[in-house]
Amino acid sequence: MPKYNVINQLGDLISTKDLKSNVFDIQPHQQALYDVINAQRAAMRQGTHATKTRAFVSGGGKKPWRQKGTGRARHGSIRSPLWRGGGVVFGPSPRNYSVKVNQKVSHLALKSALSSHFRQNQLILVDDFNLDTHKSKDFQKTLQKLNVTSKALIIVTNSNRNLTLASRNLPYVTLETAAHASVYQILNCKNLILTLDAVAYFEEVLK
């Protein structure tokens, strides 16, 4: 089991933590990461885009003029795709973009993402966040003590009110619970900050 330093919210070293190597120190599986991130990004799409074909555009039931004798081109509807205000040909329609991924692959991708941060020394273990105030300015000073000045993802098990309010006004900080943290979120940050409870959660779920 690899050992990792644990600090408090003041940036002081308080202990070391034995991390399970089968969760935090595996060789990242690139295909699993690709499949899961592709599925998670697809799930972000609403899929509500829609256009109207000639069948759904209002009007156009009557033939605009007789077939022969006018000298004009023949038409059967003013809602033909050839006309201004007519229907759209092969336009987008509502659809579900979700992609199924097996749980085994999802867990492998999550372990790969955690291990990637561990191996690149971009993982920060904090015992807990107990903030006295909900001010973002004060929380920013706390992050500076942890040497966090760029894009960061903070994963906790249960978020308290002060932590939620203090972090949401910082554009480079994302707060997420361990149960809802995604592989895409983890790989899309420079600094991964985990509380000890979050570490215990991942080691239990991904064992």
Curated annotation (Swiss-Prot):
Q: What Pfam families does this protein map onto? A: Ribosomal_L4
Keywords in alphabetical order = Ribonucleoprotein, Ribosomal protein, RNA-binding, rRNA-binding
Compositional bias annotation for Basic residues = 63-77
Spell out the GO cellular component terms annotated for this protein, sorted alphabetically and separated by semicolons.
ribonucleoprotein complex; ribosome
Question: Is this entry keyworded RNA-binding?
Answer: yes
Record has Ribosomal protein as a keyword:
yes
Q: Which GO terms describe its biological process?
A: translation
Gene Ontology MF: a single term: rRNA binding
Subunit info here reads: Part of the 50S ribosomal subunit.
Sequence similarity: Belongs to the universal ribosomal protein uL4 family.
Its job: One of the primary rRNA binding proteins, this protein initially binds near the 5'-end of the 23S rRNA. It is important during the early stages of 50S assembly. It makes multiple contacts with different domains of the 23S rRNA in the assembled 50S subunit and ribosome.
Q: What's the protein name?
A: Large ribosomal subunit protein uL4
